[in-house]
UniProtKB/Swiss-Prot annotation:
Sequence positions that bind Mg(2+) 1: D299, D303
Protein name: Alpha-isocomene synthase
Source species of the chain: Matricaria chamomilla var. recutita (German chamomile)
Enzyme class: lyase
Family: Belongs to the terpene synthase family. Tpsa subfamily.
Positions contributing to Mg(2+) 3 binding: D443, E451
Amino acid sequence: MSLQENVIRPTANFPPSVWGDQFLTYDEREDQAGLEKVVEDLKDKVRQEILGTLDVPSQHTDLLRLIDSIQRLGIAYHFEEEIDRTLHHFYDAYGDNWTGGATSVWFRIMRQHGFFVSSDVFKSYKDKNGAFKEPLENDIVGFLELYEATYLRVPGEVILDDALVFTKGRLGEISNDPLWRNSIVSTQIIEALEQPVQKRLHRHEALRYITFYQQQASCNESLLKLAKLGFNLLQSLHKKELSQVYKWWKGFDVPTNLPYARNRMVECYFWSLSVFFEPKYSESRMFLAKVFAVETILDDTYDAFGTYEELEIFTAAVHRSSVTCLDALPKNYKLIYRIILSLYEDMEKILTKMGKAHHLNYIRNAMMEYIGCYLKEAKWANDEYTPTMEEHKEVTTVSSGYKFSLIASFAAMGDAITDETFKWALTMPPLAKACCVLCRVMDDIVTHKEEQERKHVASGIQCYMKEFDVTEQHVYDVFNAKVEDAWVEMNEESLKCKDVKRPVIMRVINLARAMDVLYKNKDHYTHVGPELINHIKSLVVDPIMA
C-alpha cells in the first residue's frame, strides 16, 4: 500500500519543539554519593521526630503539622510507613472526633490518605444562625486551611460546598486588602485561589512550599535541608531518564519522517513526571512518557493526516500486532507501527524481569480499544456526522487516550499491581471514568476551536450546542461545572475504593492534576509557551540553590 495521491489532508501545522536537542546528553553529579549519605542521615532524624511523639496526645497537632510539611515539601515518599502508621493511630484514637488543633489540616490529610472522616467537624465553624463565622484577623491562615479542606469534599456535603463559596469570596477580598497585599499570606492566598493544594503537582508544590517554609519562624532546618537536597538528587535522576527517553525518540526522527505530528517528547516526559515522580517508579515513568509520545503521534495521524481508508488498514494492523503487517503499510504508517512495536518490546522486557510478562496483554487490549475508538471518530469525520452527546462521550472518553494512559501507568509498578488491577481499570470504574471525563472535557474546552479549522470530528462543544440548541458560552459553563463535579466524584471514589491500593488511586488523581497544568485555560501542550517552559525547567533543568 502507498499513500494516496492527490489527497487533501487536514494537516494542522503544529508548532515545532522549543527544546532542540538539549536533553540528549546527561552529566551525572560528581558529589551525588556524598549527598546521598547526608540525605540518609537527615531521613533518620526526621523519622525519629515523626515517631517520637506518636504516643503523646498533647503533641498530636504538632505532629499533624509536621506531616503536612513533609507532604508539601515533596519528601513524604521517604516516610510512607511512618506516615501511614501515624494516621492509622490518629484514626483509631479519634475517629471522626479530632480534638487537636488545625482541624482543616487534619481533615484534608486524612481524606488524602483514604480515611473517610466526617465533615461534621466543621459545624463548629458556623454561628447560631447557621452562617460561617468571619475569619479572625490573627487566623487568616486557618481560614485558608478551611478553603483547602473544601477541595476534599464529596457529593452531598453541603457544609463544604457552602464553605468553599464563603472562603473563596473572603480570601479574594483579603488578598486585595492593602494591609495584606505584599505579605507571605497574601501570596499563599493568591496561589491557592489559582490552584488549590488538591490539584497541584507534587513537584511544583514542593518548589512553592520550600520557598514559603524557609521564611517561617517554625521552620525545621533538618526538614528544609532534606527537602532541598532531596529535590536536587531526584532532579538528577529525572534528567537522566529524560535523556534516555529522548534518545529513544530521536532514533525515529519524527520531525523529518512524520512532519505533520507534534514533536513533544520533553513535554511527554513532564506529563509522566506529573503522574509519578518517586525514584521507585523510574521504569514506569519512562515507559509512560513513551506512551504519551505514541498517543500524540496517533492523535495527529487520525485527526490531522490520515484518510479513512488508510486508517482502517492501519487500525487492523495494530489489532494484529505483528511485524508481518509492516509490508501492507505505507512509509509513514510503517514508522508509527515500528514505534508501537518498540513500546511493546520495552514493556515486555520490564514485565519479564518482574515475572509479569502476561500483563502486556492488558496493555495491548487497552491499545486496541483506544485505537478502535479513534477509527470511529475518523468515520464520523469522514461522514460529516455530528454524534449525540451520549455517543460522543462513549467514544471520546476512550479515544482521548486517558484510559489507555492510566492502564499503561500501572504496567511497571511492581507488586502494587495485580491482574485484578488491570481488570478493574479496563471496566472503566467510577474513579477512572470521572478522571477520563475531566480530562476529555478540559481538552475539549481549549482545543475545539483550533481543531474545527480543519476537517475534524465534531467536538463535545459542538455536539452539545447542536443537541441542546445553546450558545458556546453556555456549553463552557456546563463543561467547567463537569470538571469540578468530576473532582468531587474522584474524591468520593478514592475513599470508597477499599480494594484498590493507594498507589493505583494516586495515578488516577495525578493524571487529573497534570491536566490542571497542561490544559488549564489554553492548550499548553500544543502551544508550548513561557508558562509550561518555566514549569519544565524548574523540574528538570534548574536545581534548588542551597
